[in-house]
Amino acid sequence: MSKINMLSLLKKLFKSTEVDLSQLIKDGATIIDVRSKGEFATGHVKGSINIPLEQIATSIDKLKSHSHIITCCRSGNRSGMALRTLKSKGLKNVTNGGSWQNVNQYK
């Protein structure tokens, strides 16, 4: 695959994610930042809720009432783990927003 085709494919993939995040936030999705409390204190998406990754599994009952959840962290790795945990516990409408800075650009 040529570099041009690869870039085109990546743009299509990321564009659809961006549109989804923007719309989810407009529709009132709850943003969960899974970084540590110290990391959260250094900067976060306004209105986001800090639930460190280690506490996600025990926070399921608090999160079930939310219509849609966007997880975020520093790079997208921990938020991906949080997404898998939440989905394994029965929550269906969960999206990994990646880094908190990525989510913040749509807020």
Sequence positions of predicted segments:
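Rhodanese-like catalytic fold shared by cysteine-dependent sulfurtransferases
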Residues: 2-30, 37-68, 77-107
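Short cysteine clusters
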Residues: 73
